[in-house]
């Protein structure tokens, strides 16, 4: 576990009688780019939500940077770490959601500067300088004083990526970042993620239905089915020579569809 920045150890997550994550063992190494693929309802997005403590777990253990996110109580229930501990942990994680989740009443610039000032204690000047650098990275420096409603979906998602990066995370989580976009806007978001993967020393974990993109940027691809990893390997291994029949069925459906 020494080189793994994310560890799931026999994690279980259920809603009543429906098990979403089924004794999941899963690790991501520092600096690794990992894509999670699989059918709807297989637990892909739940993995990211657990990492952000947006969802709890019923059993097992989750570690980020070697530190536990959850503690088991004497009665067997799972409780998150202390709020102080979680605040520290969350600064290591940046998440890009499907639906952008920008603050609609704030300009693009303020969307990027608010959390670094409040949470990290950056000065107004430091936060602004960092925000402008990130807007340059995502190609939106000329839109700094617009409000989210004045932007296209693709532009809003690029702001979402910049906002996550503004907290200087070690890990970036992407939850199907193009699923809410019109087809013609997908490319501009993928180009930003592609640049991050190539130029920045970030650990990246991405849930995606963009198979060709996952194949291009990933060090490893994991196929989820029924709350577990059914198969994993390099993009070449998993896409060209999948071992499991269920993996072959899924890839045939999504690539030929």
Swiss-Prot record:
<dbReference type="InterPro" id="IPR017871">
    <property type="entry name" value="ABC_transporter-like_CS"/>
</dbReference>
<keyword id="KW-0614">Plasmid</keyword>
<keyword id="KW-0813">Transport</keyword>
<keyword id="KW-0547">Nucleotide-binding</keyword>
<keyword id="KW-0067">ATP-binding</keyword>
<comment type="similarity">
    <text>Belongs to the ABC transporter superfamily.</text>
</comment>
<dbReference type="InterPro" id="IPR030679">
    <property type="entry name" value="ABC_ATPase_HisP-typ"/>
</dbReference>
<dbReference type="GO" id="GO:0015424">
    <property type="term" value="F:ABC-type amino acid transporter activity"/>
</dbReference>
<keyword id="KW-0029">Amino-acid transport</keyword>
<dbReference type="GO" id="GO:0005886">
    <property type="term" value="C:plasma membrane"/>
</dbReference>
<feature type="binding site">
    <location>
        <begin position="38"/>
        <end position="45"/>
    </location>
    <ligand>
        <name>ATP</name>
    </ligand>
</feature>
<dbReference type="InterPro" id="IPR003593">
    <property type="entry name" value="AAA+_ATPase"/>
</dbReference>
<dbReference type="InterPro" id="IPR050086">
    <property type="entry name" value="MetN_ABC_transporter-like"/>
</dbReference>
<dbReference type="InterPro" id="IPR014343">
    <property type="entry name" value="Ectoine_EhuA"/>
</dbReference>
<keyword id="KW-1003">Cell membrane</keyword>
<protein>
    <recommendedName>
        <fullName>Probable amino-acid ABC transporter ATP-binding protein y4tH</fullName>
    </recommendedName>
</protein>
<feature type="domain" description="ABC transporter">
    <location>
        <begin position="6"/>
        <end position="251"/>
    </location>
</feature>
<dbReference type="InterPro" id="IPR003439">
    <property type="entry name" value="ABC_transporter-like_ATP-bd"/>
</dbReference>
<dbReference type="InterPro" id="IPR027417">
    <property type="entry name" value="P-loop_NTPase"/>
</dbReference>
<keyword id="KW-0472">Membrane</keyword>
<dbReference type="GO" id="GO:0016887">
    <property type="term" value="F:ATP hydrolysis activity"/>
</dbReference>
<dbReference type="Pfam" id="PF00005">
    <property type="entry name" value="ABC_tran"/>
</dbReference>
<dbReference type="GO" id="GO:0005524">
    <property type="term" value="F:ATP binding"/>
</dbReference>
<comment type="function">
    <text>Probably part of a binding-protein-dependent transport system y4tEFGH for an amino acid. Probably responsible for energy coupling to the transport system.</text>
</comment>
<keyword id="KW-0997">Cell inner membrane</keyword>
């Amino acid at each position: 576990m020494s080189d793994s920045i994310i560890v799931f150890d026999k994690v279980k997550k259920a809603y009543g009688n429906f098990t979403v994550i089924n004794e999941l063992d899963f690790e991501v190494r520092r600096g690794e780019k990992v894509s999670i693929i699989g059918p709807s309802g297989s637990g892909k997005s739940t993995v990211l939500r657990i990492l952000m403590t947006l969802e709890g777990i019923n059993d097992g253990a989750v570690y980020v940077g070697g530190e536990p996110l959850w503690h088991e109580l004497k009665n067997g229930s799972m409780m998150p770490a202390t709020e102080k501990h979680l605040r520290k942990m969350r600064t290591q994680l940046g998440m890009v959601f499907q639906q952008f989740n920008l603050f609609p009443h704030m300009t693009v610039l303020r969307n990027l500067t608010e959390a670094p000032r409040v949470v990290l204690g950056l000065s107004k000047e430091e936060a602004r300088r960092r925000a402008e650098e990130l807007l340059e990275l995502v190609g939106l420096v000329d839109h700094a004083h617009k409000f989210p409603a004045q932007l296209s979906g693709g532009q809003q998602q690029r702001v979402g990526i910049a906002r996550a990066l503004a907290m200087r995370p070690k890990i970036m989580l992407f939850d199907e970042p193009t699923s809410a976009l019109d087809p013609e806007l997908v490319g501009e978001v993928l180009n930003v993620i592609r640049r991050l993967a190539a130029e920045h020393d970030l650990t990246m974990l991405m849930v995606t239905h963009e198979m060709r993109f996952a194949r291009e940027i990933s060090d490893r691809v994991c196929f989820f089915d029924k709350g577990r990893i059914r198969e994993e390997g390099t993009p070449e291994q998993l896409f060209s020579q999948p071992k499991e029949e269920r993996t072959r069925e899924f890839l045939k459906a999504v690539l030929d569809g």
